[in-house]
Amino acid sequence: MSKAKAYYAHSMRKYNSSEEAEEFAFIQKHCRGEVICPNVNLGELGDIEHYLEVIKSVDCVYATEFRGYVGRGVFDECTFALKNKIKVFVVRKDHKGKFFVQEVIESIETNRFNFISFGCLIAK
């Protein structure tokens, strides 16, 4: 059986941070396959459509939140994946700071005028 291929959807506010590195390491361990990090593996592609094309090629998406919400880009990536029957997981921290994963069943727009807290992810 081939290894899973995943996409790490996260806020650009986390790019090149220790938080990004910690999340990425956790996702790699959890996925046990190839993980595409747009910041590291893709760079600036411009339009969201280019990132959605990459998502078409993966088995699942791991998303992280920023202050309990996802920004417009992560929202669009997760919504696209869900509509295309690609599994989406949200990576969160418990009260002790330990990462855990939940499967996402829906993405909901919460504030179309704020691209940082644009939506939220509803997990099982």
Predicted regions and their residues:
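Conserved catalytic or regulatory cores that recognize and/or transform ribose-phosphate-containing ligands
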Residues: 1-124
